[in-house]
């Protein structure tokens, strides 16, 4: 019965059209690879895999919609398990009611969440529950936590990574105790934050790195921040990254979108929408980068840039919810609790705001001069005006009726 359900769902999810050899898109083959986890089989399964992916779910209800939603999640996991079958990654489901004791032991407390066990670490996946996103996330997770830079061409590739937090350190060798501490620190943040290292003096010179020094790069910033007081312990590196992991300007990414959205400041986000591939969107993004660089020392400023191309399924929802047109650049302040929002007036694509105008608008947001509560008040005022109009219309009708009665007399 399970396979029959999965095949039905798979027909809707995946195209079965034939393609030329070399471009055969994976379709679910009907083999069950995702198993139910229990206290009895937990240790056996844990020993079998280097990485264990666990979907912690509420008991499946009798509601047909809930059942279909569960089956959709199940087929996504089955497809991911099929694609990564050769990678020694296990996939299991944990029923919150049947396996409550095991879930408590593992520290699971949020139904509908996906957890990954790697060694003694538990990583919660806080991104889009889609097969392609999950595959990329898990492949990043099984790689070494630190990528080694050995040449000037690799330095160029490193420098082109601008929308991620990244760290790079210079060490004597892979056997160095300080490199080991760096590697251990990297495991705490894998795969969300990228760690790089070099043992090459030429590479270190090009990056202005001294022996045992680590530079911290905030997204979209021109210059790195050297971490003070080298050499560092693992704990010191972890503490520094945690204190600086909310950038001034960051990109909303499918692999950690919910974690980013929950990391708000006082319940709000400053949200620009801009397509990087579009000329106007690219220009607007460059202006935003300039504003972020000029205000990188402001701890109260956090801007979450969204490229609509990254989230095609959400474009219509955002346009309806925020009442904006995402075919042109936008910037607004969004209340994460109720999605109330206020958006900067941008007349047209040919008249984008300058960096100074954006800074003034952002200052008004941070000071509270512009806020989503004002938008609520305006809506209430509009409703009151409409009520007054209705009252006036009602009174006019009564007066007309009175006049008619007098005429009849």
UniProtKB/Swiss-Prot annotation:
Keywords: Calcium, Glycoprotein, Metal-binding, Muscle protein, Phosphoprotein, Sarcoplasmic reticulum, Signal. GO terms for molecular function: calcium ion binding. Residues 373-409 have a biased composition (Acidic residues). The modification Phosphotyrosine is found at residue 282. It comes from the Eukaryota. Residues 364-409 are annotated as: Disordered. Detected in heart muscle (at protein level). GO terms for cellular component: sarcoplasmic reticulum; sarcoplasmic reticulum lumen; terminal cisterna; Z disc. It is found in: Sarcoplasmic reticulum lumen. The keyword Calcium applies. Phosphorylation in the C-terminus, probably by CK2, moderately increases calcium buffering capacity. Pfam families: Calsequestrin. One of its GO terms (biological process) is regulation of cardiac muscle contraction by regulation of the release of sequestered calcium ion. Residues 1-19 form the signal peptide. Glycans are attached at residue 335. InterPro entries: Calsequestrin (IPR001393), Calsequestrin_C (IPR041860), Calsequestrin_CS (IPR018233), Calsequestrin_middle_dom (IPR041858), Calsequestrin_N (IPR041859), Thioredoxin-like_sf (IPR036249). Monomer, homodimer and homooligomer. Mostly monomeric in the absence of calcium. Forms higher oligomers in a calcium-dependent manner. Dimers associate to form tetramers, that then form linear homomer chains. Interacts with ASPH and TRDN. Belongs to the calsequestrin family. Calsequestrin is a high-capacity, moderate affinity, calcium-binding protein and thus acts as an internal calcium store in muscle. Calcium ions are bound by clusters of acidic residues at the protein surface, especially at the interface between subunits. Can bind around 60 Ca(2+) ions. Regulates the release of lumenal Ca(2+) via the calcium release channel RYR2; this plays an important role in triggering muscle contraction. Plays a role in excitation-contraction coupling in the heart and in regulating the rate of heart beats. This is Calsequestrin-2. It comes from Oryctolagus cuniculus (Rabbit).
């Amino acid at each position: 019965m399970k396979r029959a359900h999965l095949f039905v769902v798979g027909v809707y999810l995946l195209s079965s059209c034939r393609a030329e050899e070399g471009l055969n898109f994976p379709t679910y083959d009907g083999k069950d690879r995702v198993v139910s986890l229990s206290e009895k089989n937990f240790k056996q399964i844990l020993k079998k895999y280097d990485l264990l992916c666990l979907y912690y779910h509420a008991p499946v209800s009798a509601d047909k919609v809930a059942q279909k939603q569960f089956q959709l999640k199940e087929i996504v996991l089955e497809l991911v398990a099929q694609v990564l079958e050769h990678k020694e990654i296990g996939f299991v489901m944990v029923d919150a009611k049947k396996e409550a004791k095991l879930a408590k032991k593992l520290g699971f407390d949020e139904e509908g969440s996906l957890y990954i066990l790697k060694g003694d670490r538990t990583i919660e996946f806080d991104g889009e529950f889609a097969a392609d996103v999950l595959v990329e996330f898990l492949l990043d997770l099984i790689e070494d936590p630190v990528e080694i830079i050995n040449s000037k061409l690799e330095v160029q590739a490193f420098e082109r990574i601008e929308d991620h937090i990244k760290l790079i350190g210079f060490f004597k060798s892979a056997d160095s105790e300080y490199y080991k501490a760096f590697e251990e620190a990297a495991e705490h943040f894998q795969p969300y934050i990228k760690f790089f290292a070099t043992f090459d003096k030429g590479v270190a010179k090009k990056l202005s790195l001294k022996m045992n020094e680590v530079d911290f790069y905030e997204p979209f910033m021109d210059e790195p921040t050297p971490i003070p007081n080298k050499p560092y312990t693992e704990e010191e590196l972890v503490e520094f990254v945690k204190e600086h992991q909310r950038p001034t300007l960051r990109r909303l990414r499918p692999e950690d979108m919910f974690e980013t959205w929950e990391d708000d400041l006082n319940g709000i986000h400053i949200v620009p929408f801009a397509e990087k591939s579009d000329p106007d969107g690219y220009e607007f993004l460059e202006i935003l980068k300039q504003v972020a660089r000029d205000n990188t020392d402001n701890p109260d400023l956090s801007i979450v840039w969204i490229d609509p191309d990254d989230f095609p399924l959400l474009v219509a929802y955002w346009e309806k919810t925020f009442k904006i047109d995402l075919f042109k650049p936008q910037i607004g302040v969004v209340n994460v609790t109720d999605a109330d929002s206020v958006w900067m007036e941008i007349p047209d694509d040919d008249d984008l705001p300058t960096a100074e105008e954006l800074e003034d608008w952002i200052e008004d947001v941070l000071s509270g001069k512009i806020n989503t509560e004002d938008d609520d008040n305006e809506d209430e005022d509009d409703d009151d005006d409409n009520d007054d109009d209705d009252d006036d219309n009602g009174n006019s009708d009564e007066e007309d009726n009175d006049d008619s009665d007098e005429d009849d007399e």
